[in-house]
Amino acid sequence: MSAPDGPLARLEARLTREWQRRGALAWALTPFACVFGLCAALRRTAYAQGWKKPVDVGVPVVVVGNVTVGGTGKTPTVIALVDALRAAGFTPGIVSRGYGANVKAPTAVTTASRASAGGDEPLLIARRTGAPVWVCPDRVAAAQALRAAHPDVDVIVSDDGLQHYRLARTVELVVFDHRLGGNGFLLPAGPLREPLSRHRDATLVNDPYSGALPPWPDTYSLALTPGAAWHLDQPALRRPLSQFANERVLAAAGIGAPERFFATLRSAGLAPATRALPDHYAFADNPFVDDAVDAILITEKDAVKLGASWRDARLWVVPVEAALDPRLIALVVEKLRGRSPA
C-alpha cells in the first residue's frame, strides 16, 4: 500500500494531468493505445456479431459505467437510481466487481460486511440503499447468485461493468465528470477505455464548474450535492459544512477524483488543506496523527473502511447526494417496461 501522497498517488496525479492534453507523453504512448483499441474493438465486435453470446440473467439490467478511467460519480448515481427505481415500483438489486477486495466467488455484501471482504463502494451502496448487493469479478455469476438469493428482485443495477459485455443489459448509462474524454486518446495515451462515440442509452455529466453539457444526444446534467457532515464516532451528530469555515480543516479523499471532493468543500465556503490518497486506500493505520487541525473531512467511501478501532475525534464524513433528471428516470423506467419513452 502506498503512503498518502506517495509514489502511487503522484503517478495517478501525473497521468490525470497528462490525459487532459495531447503532450509529448500522450503522443509517445499512442502506439500502445492503438493496440489497446484494436483489442477492445475485437472484443466488442465478437459480441455485436454474435460470435460470443451475452448471458441473459432473467431480469432487466441497467449498467451504470464510464468510458474513462477514474472516478466520475458512478456510486452516488447508482444509489440515486436504486431509490428512483424503488419509487417507480421496482425491486432492484445491485452487482459490482468488488474492487479492492479479494473476491473470487459471488459474495453478498450486507450492511454488516467489511470493506476488505466486498469492496468499499459496494459496502457504501449496501448501507445507503438497503438493497441486495452481490460482488464478483464475473458479474454474470454475481447476478445469478443475487437472483437465487432474492427471487423478488426484478431489475439489476450493475455498478460499473460497461465493458463486461458477457452480461446482457437493457439500459446503458455512461457517467462523465467535467473532464469528459480528456485528450480523446485511448489508454494508455489518454483516459478512454472505449471511444467517445460508443453507443449508450443516455449520458450523465457532472460538471460543477461550468454546468455546461456537451452536444451529445440524450445527455443529462448530474448534480452532486454535499450534505451535512456527520461525526465518524457519533453518526447522529451532524454539522452543516458552513460551521467548519473558521476552523483548521484537512480534507482527505481516497477516491478516483479527489480534487472534485476538495472543490465541493471550497464551493461550500471552506479553505481546507488537502490530501489526495490513492484510490481505494486501505487505511491500515491513521495517516492523520501528525496533522495539527481541528477537523478532518473525508468521503463516505473512505468512511466505510474505518472500523471500530478508529478513535480520532476530528473525523467528519461528508455525504454526497446525486440528483437525477426526471427525464432520465422516465427514459430508464420506460425502457425497463419495454416501451419507448414519450
UniProtKB/Swiss-Prot annotation:
EC numbers on record: 2.7.1.130
GO cellular component: plasma membrane
GO molecular function: ATP binding; tetraacyldisaccharide 4'-kinase activity
One of the protein's GO biological processes: lipopolysaccharide core region biosynthetic process
Pathway: Glycolipid biosynthesis; lipid IV(A) biosynthesis; lipid IV(A) from (3R)-3-hydroxytetradecanoyl-[acyl-carrier-protein] and UDP-N-acetyl-alpha-D-glucosamine: step 6/6
Entry keyword set: ATP-binding, Kinase, Lipid A biosynthesis, Lipid biosynthesis, Lipid metabolism, Nucleotide-binding, Transferase
Class in the EC hierarchy, top level: transferase
Pfam families: LpxK
Catalytic reaction annotation: a lipid A disaccharide + ATP = a lipid IVA + ADP + H(+)
Binding site for ATP: 68-75
Family membership: Belongs to the LpxK family.
Free-text function comment from the UniProt entry: Transfers the gamma-phosphate of ATP to the 4'-position of a tetraacyldisaccharide 1-phosphate intermediate (termed DS-1-P) to form tetraacyldisaccharide 1,4'-bis-phosphate (lipid IVA).
NCBIfam families: lpxK
Cross-referenced HAMAP family: LpxK
Protein name: Tetraacyldisaccharide 4'-kinase
